[in-house]
Amino acid sequence: MLGTSTKCSKRDCNYAKENISRIMPTIGLGYKQNFEKKTADTQSSCKLLLVALLESFCKHSDQTPEQSKQMFLYVAHSLQNSGIIDFEFSEELEPIRNAYADSLHNLLSKAFRSTLPMSSTKDSKKSRYSSPDGVLAKTASFLSVLSDGGYEDDVMNVKPSVNVLSNRLNHLPVEALESCFPQTTLESSTFADFCEHKDGTGNLSFSNFDSFPTVQRSRYASDFEELELLGKGGYGSVYKARNKFDGVEYALKKIPLRLRSFSTSSNIFRESRTLARLNHPNVIRFFSSWVELLPSSEKQIEEEPLASADETLSQSADIDNFMFDMDTGLLQHTYPSSVQILFQEDSVADDLTPCYSTKNSTCNLTDLFKKEADQDYAESHDCSSTTSQVDTLGKLAPTKSASEMLLMDSFLSEREEDECSNIPSFDQQPLCLYIQMALCEETLEKHINRRNKHIHGVMSKGLRNCYILLFARILEGVLYLHDAMHLVHRDLKPRNIFLSSGVHSEPCSVCLPNFSDEDNVEVSNAYEPVNQRTLCVVPKIGDFGLVLSQSDNLEEGTNSSAESSFVGTSTYAAPELFSKHMRSVMNNNSSTDIYALGILFFELLYPFNTRMERASAIANLKKGIFPHDFLDSMPEEASLIRSMLSSSNKRPTAAQLLTSNLFHDLVVNELHVYQALLEDAEKRNNNLKAELNILRVLNPNYDC
């Protein structure tokens, strides 16, 4: 309750409004953008649901499939011209519309089954007839006819489907229905007109309702055999799967989704749309993508956090995830929905994953109001009520502003929450976006980690040339993205560079040493492992989940995830992306990719003993400090890296890098690399011969 006097009540209202106006500016930007984004997503979801129902209605007409589609497009275009919908009727969103229809179908089935226990006895029926909920009681009476004959057992053994209902209604006399609904006639009902057909005996047949359109059977389950989990990324998980028809193994990326998060401006399809347009030897190959409902038996993905359409959960095997509030600068320990920067640190242990929550661990508005209330009202002499004004804030007089509505929404009563919790969510069954790509199990990160177990410090010139050529191939792929496709990757790092097996004659292939996984391998004075072989690989850029077009205007529209937050890997993030003022301007600038490539190039050329050494060296590198042995042995490479890590307007482009002295003649450079590899092989053979001669001297009886 509020205060015991009208004077106190008015003061309570004024006090609450003053607190709202005082608190909201400090948190207003984050909540305002979050509120506007949720509102836009809700409106778009409503439009998708409307179009899904319209499409289902057209499919139930007595027309041919072609005529039904034409009828659907005619009505959809009319609604679009009226401003009611946008492009929710487009062909690419058809799987989403089918999922909406199927989810509504499942919800109706659950609602139908929830009424069955109400019709267990005749006495309970009579009491319900006299209750205020007369309509519900009569509905339960009608449904009790269906429950006879073991129907409840059938419900437990079959999937929720309107087909079960239609099978019970096929031979149900119309009089039985009319006795339950005397005030209406089925002939005049719009729903009955939609689904009613009568056979020769006058019985009702729900053949159209029986053919309610649902999402097709799982293409993934029928066409692919899942082999193993390859890894987890920001949006979903990647699995190795074999196609049952061609026998080829592919990489299948699964991105769990929620229906309510879909919108026509959604970026959730950005990766598949981008991959479908790309065609370059140094870019991962794309085959197909589709959306389908997750089967109820597939528990593994359902237990994972579901990605919304415009948010990314960087939940891969990375232990250090930082989040900074853009308005307050406070470090958050969870994943709130307010304005934030989310950076993904490098993995330390594959079995460590962060825990997510929707609540902030910083300032709590309720506690803040309560402290101020105790302080202010302790000096008050006019109020006779001792009831906490904070506890009753949600029951104040209605307000008009959106900021007050946001605050009021956080004070819902427990009773309202309990009542709502008993009703199932419309989109409880999650969707999944599948992206089928070429399989590349080896990544540059894995190769570098193996190499660093064998080589420490500065490498020989021959090996350096190998990695310089490898970096040139990566630059060619980045040049294609920037200049030909006008895209910014935004997450270039060794983990997102895949190494596909190739041959010497294949374009864009590079010969690299094949280091073993053993930790204790003998290393010579020339920093060359005694036992190693060469392999040919083609570097391919992958993981386009954060890609943006250079032409995107990030300053327009509050629904852009790029505007509200930046998601990436902090080790490779350009410094301007840490500034909230520069982020909206530089987030889709190609210079941010060049900065990440500068860090990557340094890692390629300079092996580290430990992770701590790597972190310290990269931190110094960002300050312009190079290791002394790196500067002495590679001055030209150091100069190039320094230019790539300079201010954004001074960084070279990918084209300028490829025309630099270090990469000016790739053909000649490639010949030097192969010549260096040959010299290294001859050197290793001579070392082996020397070791054999020593063994013969030490053991004359040794036969080799």
From Swiss-Prot:
GO terms for cellular component: cytoplasm; cytosol; nucleus. Mediates down-regulation of protein synthesis in response to stress conditions by the phosphorylation of the alpha subunit of eIF-2 (tif211) on 'Ser-52'. Protein synthesis is inhibited at the level of initiation. Activity is inhibited in the presence of heme. Keywords: ATP-binding, Kinase, Nucleotide-binding, Phosphoprotein, Protein synthesis inhibitor, Serine/threonine-protein kinase, Stress response, Transferase. It comes from the Eukaryota. GO terms for biological process: negative regulation of cytoplasmic translational initiation in response to stress; signaling. It comes from Schizosaccharomyces pombe (strain 972 / ATCC 24843). Signal peptide: none annotated. Autophosphorylated. One of its GO terms (molecular function) is eukaryotic translation initiation factor 2alpha kinase activity. Belongs to the protein kinase superfamily. Ser/Thr protein kinase family. GCN2 subfamily. PROSITE patterns: PROTEIN_KINASE_ATP, PROTEIN_KINASE_DOM, PROTEIN_KINASE_ST. ATP binds at L230, G231, K232, G233, G234, Y235, G236, S237, V238, K253. Induction: By heat shock and arsenic. The active site is at D491 (proton acceptor). Its EC number is 2.7.11.1. Gene3D superfamilies: Phosphorylase Kinase, domain 1 (3.30.200.20), Transferase(Phosphotransferase) domain 1 (1.10.510.10). This is Eukaryotic translation initiation factor 2-alpha kinase 1. Residues 224-667 form the Protein kinase domain. InterPro entries: CC_SR_Kinase, HRI2_3H, Kinase-like_dom_sf, Prot_kinase_dom, Protein_kinase_ATP_BS, Ser/Thr_kinase_AS. It catalyses: L-seryl-[protein] + ATP = O-phospho-L-seryl-[protein] + ADP + H(+); L-threonyl-[protein] + ATP = O-phospho-L-threonyl-[protein] + ADP + H(+). It is an enzyme of class 2 (transferase).
